[in-house]
UniProtKB/Swiss-Prot annotation:
2-oxoglutarate (OG)- and Fe(II)-dependent dioxygenase (2OGD) involved in scopoletin biosynthesis. Converts feruloyl CoA into 6'-hydroxyferuloyl CoA, and, at low efficiency, caffeoyl-CoA into 6'-hydroxycaffeate, but has no activity with p-coumaroyl-CoA. Belongs to the iron/ascorbate-dependent oxidoreductase family. Its EC number is 1.14.11.61. Pathway: Phenylpropanoid metabolism. Mostly expressed in tubers, and, at low levels, in underground stems, stems, leaves and petioles. This is Feruloyl CoA ortho-hydroxylase F6H1-3. It comes from Ipomoea batatas (Sweet potato). InterPro entries: DIOX_N (IPR026992), IPNS-like_FE2OG_OXY (IPR044861), IPNS-like_sf (IPR027443), Oxoglu/Fe-dep_dioxygenase_dom (IPR005123), Plant_2OG-oxidoreductases (IPR050295). Induction: Transiently induced at low levels by fungal (F.oxysporum f.sp. batatas O-17) and chitosan treatments, in association with the accumulation of umbelliferone and its glucoside (skimmin) in the tubers. Binds 1 Fe(2+) ion per subunit. 2-oxoglutarate binds at Y216, R299, S301. It comes from the Eukaryota. Fe cation binds at H231, D233, H289.
Length: 358
């Protein structure tokens, strides 16, 4: 083993986390085997026995959205039965999708010292964060992923703080998704018989947004690790753009089996987050998902997390309780909920249980 590689492997945390090399830096060294710090327990790895190969999440064509009420019904049904669906003919131009994917690669190909300017230790703002894995300080086994997280406050802040390698493309992608997000949420609220989205509800549903750029390098021994461990999102909705490599798996409702989300050119993946599960009093399902590592290809994805504001109180919507439903969840300060999620390693649906009424 070359001396440089031996030195890196003896102190992976410094190299990967503190020096900003990320897991991409490890992969670029031509590793022949997976470092022990990334080996996941057997129960956290996906196996062929737990995957259903002839099933997948719904694909919904939005081309008739304005004229056909069945489209809204399909959206609500998918949110109830799957918590995940793909949308096509959504109105976001294909070139916008391709440009934000290219910008993601451009950022992660920057030198480590350039990316590290945006790390937890160096970034001038908590709203811009480059990192690796999920919560390295709390994980027994690391995840094979690097990320850039950009919390949107204003165009002015983005211009000042977001990395120039991907800033314009990330903003353009977010702007182009805004109309789709609003229409999705309007359809989902209609399915709950909530017909008016006032200022308070708009804040609860889409008061804040964060866009992530995720990079999953080619991995030695991919079967021993994960790109992302089992979790559900803390968002209201997540709008995910994935590339053509594949690797996203979704747990089928009320089962221990998983289905692959096949890449469809031009499609966007939508999933219900914990906040919407709580707001809908459990009607819409925030489902566990995970990403496998890949031994042959690098993979990227670009999710937009649509969230309540940090100081919003989330709980079952009043309209649902007024109709006689019993509350399944308590009211929770959203920032407390998010802190609970980020203080620990990925652990499936444990966070949403934190909000349940015992």
């Amino acid at each position: 083993m070359p001396a440089v590689l031996s030195s890196v492997l003896s102190n992976i945390t410094d190299f990967v986390v503190h020096e900003g090399n990320g897991v991409k830096g490890l992969a670029d060294m031509g590793l022949q085997s997976l470092p022990k710090q990334y080996i996941q327990p057997a129960e956290e790895r996906i196996t062929t026995s737990t995957v259903i190969v002839d099933d997948t999440i719904p694909v919904i064509d939005l081309s008739e959205w304005g004229s056909d009420p069945k489209v809204g019904d399909l959206i609500c049904e998918a949110a109830e039965k799957w918590g995940f669906f793909q949308i096509v003919n959504h109105g976001v131009p294909l070139e916008v999708l391709e440009e934000v994917k290219a910008a993601t690669y451009r950022f992660f190909r920057l030198p480590a010292e350039e990316k590290n300017k945006h790390s937890k230790d160096n970034s001038p703002s908590n709203n811009v964060r480059y990192g690796t894995s999920f919560t390295p300080h709390a994980e027994k086994a690391l995840e094979w992923k690097d990320f850039l997280s950009l919390f949107y406050v204003s165009d002015e802040e983005a211009a000042a703080l977001w990395p120039s390698a991907c800033r314009d493309e990330a903003l353009t992608f977010m702007r182009n998704c805004d109309a789709v997000i609003k229409r999705l949420l309007k359809s989902l609220m209609k399915g709950l018989n909530v017909t008016e989205i006032d200022g308070t509800k708009e804040s609860l549903l889409m008061g804040s947004k964060r866009i992530n750029m995720n990079y999953y390098p080619k991995c030695p021994n991919p079967e021993l690790t994960v790109g992302v461990g089992r979790h559900s999102d803390v968002s209201t909705l997540t709008i995910l753009l994935q590339d053509q490599i594949g690797g996203l798996y979704v747990r089928k409702l009320d089962s221990d089996t998983w289905v692959h989300v096949p890449p469809i050119n031009g499609a966007i993946v939508i999933n219900v987050g914990d906040a919407l599960q709580i707001l809908s009093n459990g009607r819409y399902k925030s489902i566990e998902h995970r990403v496998i590592a890949n031994g042959s290809n690098n993979r990227i994805s670009v999710p937009i997390f649509v969230n309540p504001r940090p100081n919003d109180i989330i709980g079952p919507l009043p309209e649902l309780l007024e109709s006689g439903e019993k509350a399944v969840y308590k009211n929770v300060l959203y920032s407390d909920y998010v802190k609970h999620f980020f203080r620990k390693a990925h652990d499936g649906k444990e966070t949403v249980d934190f909000a349940k009424i015992n």
